[in-house]
Amino acid sequence: METEVKLTKLAQCAGCGAKVGAGTLAKLLDGIPTRSDERLLVGFDKSDDASVYKIDENTALVQTLDFFPPIVDDPEMFGEIAAVNAISDIYAMGADPKLALNIMCVTKDMPKDSIQAILRGGYKKAYEAGVIITGGHTIHDQEPKYGLSVSGFVHPEKFLTNSGAKPGDVLILTKPLGVGILTTSAKAEFIDQKVMDKIYDQMRQLNKYARDIMVKYEVHSCTDVTGFGLLGHGYEMAQGSDVTIHFMKEEIPYHKEALSMADLGMIPEGAYRNRKYASEGVSKARKINRALEDILYDPQTSGGLMIAVSENDAKNLLEDLQNTIPCAKIIGYIEEKEEKSIILE
């Protein structure tokens, strides 16, 4: 009988909290040569969720890659969360995912049952998304890791980016925040299992359903809120769109338990990186609780979509989303460029 392995004990970082900080990443990519191609509509120079390559007048290829170390101990659940997180980038571009390849790192003494369970979890969520996993690559490493390289398709004039927000747009978020803080708390055994079951369910929810609804409306920009936190991804959207985002802090959904855990200091390292990256571009119109501010910088794993939609369509889109995703909320609005990229109201 194989020994049960606690996956999170094998990893220093968990989920999207392992992501290299946005500021560090920008420095690493500075000076790296890029090849221009008139068919490459979105490349890594845009800091977007995926690349977009025009195949013909009706079809563009959308590609992304995402993998990370375990955020939960259950191997099948880890596979599900990692797959949902990877596929999400395709949805954030308004595209339809179709094909994927496994990316996997395993320790030399990792039980076969655990490895197979991770793969089963990935296949399960890929199937729900309508994605075919056609193969992959596995190597030995000191820590287990899993994710997917995903390809999808979209009309070359209908894809979304994180740099298309316009003044007057309304911002909608489809999942509550606090995942990084709560998973950090769970690793330290500070949080009730019932609370974590709710968080694990959220991380396994595909953004497919939000994507299928939002493409019916006049959406100008979209990104998924993951490793850089709400303010990090908001900062990228504001910078890329040359606008200022006003976040209404009282309207931002988050798990209440994350507030008390943040007060106890259960802050993942990624939150500090995100704060260092984005804080200079953030202005606080009113005093904000430090724990709530930590939640706004908290790295999310398999987070929701942040959608910039025209004011005329915002109410109808929100109602449509809430029929399937009750936690979707309007969290802010877009204005012309001001001194700061983000205003917290």
Residue ranges of model-derived segments:
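N-terminal glycine-rich phosphate/pyrophosphate-binding loops that anchor nucleotide-derived ligands
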Residues: M1-A92, V131, K166-I172, P176, ...
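Glycine-/charge-enriched secondary-structure boundary and capping motifs
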Residues: E2-C13, T24, M110-I132, Q142-P144, ...
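A generic local secondary-structure boundary/capping motif
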Residues: L40-V42, A50-Y53, D89-Y91, Y123, ...
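Glycine-rich anion-binding loops of enzyme active sites
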Residues: E57-L61, D66-V72, D96-I191, Y333
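Active-site glycine-rich loop that binds ribose-phosphate moieties when present
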Residues: S149-K158, K194-M214, I288-R290
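Short, compositionally biased
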Residues: T183-I199, T324-C327
